[in-house]
Amino acid sequence: NKAVWDAFLQYKIERQHLSQKEEKELRSFIEEKRYIEWSARLRDTGERLPLPIRREINKGGTSKKRIIYSYPPEMNQMLKIIAYCLYEYDSVFSKNCYAFRREYGVKDAIHRIRTTGGIAQKYCLKVDIHNYFNSIDVQILLEKLSFLKGGNEELYGLFERLLTADEALVKVEDGRYENVQEKRGAMAGIPVSPFFANVYLKDTDAYFEKRGILYFRYSDDILIFADTKEQLQEYRDILYEKIRDCRLERNPDKVMVCEPGQMWEFLGFCYRDGKVDLADHTIRKMKHKMKRKAEALRRWQRKKGLSGDKAAKGFIKAMNYKFFAREEGTEFTWCRWFFPNITTDKGLKELDAYMQQCIRYCVTGRYYKGNYRIRYEQMKEWGYRNLVAEYYKGMITKDREK
């Protein structure tokens, strides 16, 4: 249905989800009606589906890697339109599930947290599920997807074929791709995996919602509040049992229990004294990225015998991309995630100050007082974007739109 494709394209453009290249490719795919052939291929249960490519990408701010999957471009376009249309099933999810939903997400979670009376006086449990997407049990997931059979047997059949292939392509040293047999779970990185992730724990979400328990889930991050320590332990035991029943594992290093009045973190934010700011971990992780990039560019500048401003400009360009562009394999944009939801600029000021130190280091190769001869105005001329200024610029724009 071309009208659906046109609506999908407009939706993506309005939300600035597409680069110029991506928009051009999608327009071409629609105008040439390549979706007609692909629709027939996906409906043909006798046709073997393309295999996804398995890749490892850096896990922000650490030496760890995370595994993502991606299908060939045209197959990926088909999965994107399917993901877009899956929003018709949004009503099956509880209101305490905030991930990957249209016009409902992290800002609503933060608003609920901020407007819940007495939340600072409650006990809090933060739980993270280890390798959530790729460790999802496919047979359990297919059972949970069975509600699709009533109205869309073909869609269920396609998902069954996607999920049970247990095979992927991996690039080897000489540039070739080899087949590997493996359990892929919901395949993090493919367009429909967020829907699978929401479905997989929807019964757990519904359990806590039905009982009026203050519970928040965003994908693999879960936050629960209780009035007493004993009550929190009861909720914890129930949650852990449900996680085990789904054959998932908790990440023990990321479990956090907070008593009333203590600061707690969720989704990269921290809540302290009624204010929402960048979490300490978010700040540390970003500083680590800045330091590594500055040192790498300084080494490159010296090796090439270039002037210091070349390294500084390279660093600024990299940071602008990090803060204001989409993250690889996702539609995540750092500034769009954090700026609308924080209520103080304290964390941004800390990052700005550190970023300016790194820019000056790129020029001189040292961290010392003499670096201040490199003026703020000079950094602006090189393209530096002050985070605090960008934050308030966004607030002004938002107020005008109201």
Region locations from a protein language model:
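Active-site-proximal segment of RNA-dependent polymerases
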Residues: 78-137, 379
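Non-catalytic, polymerase-adjacent accessory regions of viral genome-replication enzymes
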Residues: 1-37, 366-376, 380, 392-402
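Reverse-transcriptase-like RNA-dependent polymerase core
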Residues: 39-63, 157-176
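Conserved polymerase palm-domain catalytic core
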Residues: 116-219, 223-242, 248, 258, ...
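Short Gly/Ser/Thr- and Asp/Glu-enriched loop/turn motifs at secondary-structure junctions
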Residues: 50-52, 217-220, 253
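Conserved pre-motif C helix in the palm subdomain of viral-like polymerases
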Residues: 63-94, 181-209
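Right-hand nucleic-acid polymerase module
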Residues: 76, 80, 177-181, 206, ...
